[in-house]
Amino acid sequence: MKRLFLLSVLCLLVLGISAQTAKEEIFADVHRSAANYYAYPAVTAVQTVPPVGYKPFYLSHYARHGSRFLIDPDDYEQPLEVMREADRNGVLTGLGKKTLCVLDSMSRMAKGRYGELTPLGARQHRGIAERMYKNFPEIFKGQVEIDARSTVVIRCILSMMAECNQLQALNPKLRFKNDASYHDMYYMNFSGDPHIKEMRKSPEVKAAKEAIRKEHIHPERLMKTLFANTDYLKWKVDAGELMTSLFDVASNMQSHDTGLELYSLFTKEECYDLWQLSNRGWYISFGPSPLTKGEMPSVEANLLENILNTADTCVVRKDSYATLRFGHESCLLPLACLLELDDCGYQTDDLDKLDAIWRNYKIFPMAGNIQFVFYRKKGSDDILVKVLLNERETKLPVKSDVAPYYHWKDVELYYRNKLEALRK
């Protein structure tokens, strides 16, 4: 008994040590502060062995496109022009001049490629495909059919092709059906709910976001390192806007194979502060925040219904099958919240405590993905499923005696009931 007690205490201590706060995680790797620009992290998770006799036979996923260029030309040009004008007026420090050079290089690199997939983004999806093939070989064996669909955006189409080409290289016998059509956009990238749009622009949301900006944007130290003239800085530069613009460029530079960087402009504390701005913003506008009545994830009801309906047609097939979908983080994050994967559905009015539980970089990095993997056993009609978030097993809001595997009938019933409640 004493030995068991000591072992329990030791386990608790290990768990306490291993459970890092968001601040500690960002201080350990500032790239996490990039939020939705965070490059897909290395996968080290081990897959739990399924119950005896169960084999995977169907995989259904929704993946975000891989790493990309920033979308809007102004993302590069606005901070660049601020620094150019300051240079023309002779008020940049040495670090300011160096920053100008880096911004100019990034602007030229991005010209004509705004929003496009980078080579790293393609590699991310090839890696995901290779691990799917390795982890679930039974699904991709022989002349299996794979239905792969993308939104109509080029970076998503190229992400789809990268993943499919890698699977084809691993098994040339695989048969693919690829599509990217406006016909499927009602569930692949739905954005037509006026109620959701109105809630995101409500006075309460605007006030909350403005308060968050005031709390977490502190540009004074950074500006002093870039500008030698405080009067010029005061009258000619929107310091807060420049700081966040520089941080966006710095954050997304991990999407490229380049030795250039701007993260060194920021202290780790500033990186954490600016990430909180992003984390809270995404939580309010796309997550289950009480400020938006927890309704934001419902925007992905069509996508969840498609996942359920498609699964119903595939689990009765005798052969294996895969359904691959490629879209955006603005769909992936609310889908994870709608599914209540792990703590994605966490709700709190206290935003100061939000990042103790809810951290956006764990949900939707570049190439982020949700995989439903279905298992069956010969002689049994009890289908099992597990759900992976970025290739890591998750906890579902359903009871199970074989977790992280769940009985499909229980999972489907839970989500069907949830969809029905949303549409009343």
Regions found by a protein language model. Name each.
Residues M1-K23:
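Bacterial Sec-dependent N-terminal signal peptides
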Residues Q20-A122, R126-D147, T151-T323, G327-K424:
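Signature for phosphate-centric chemistry
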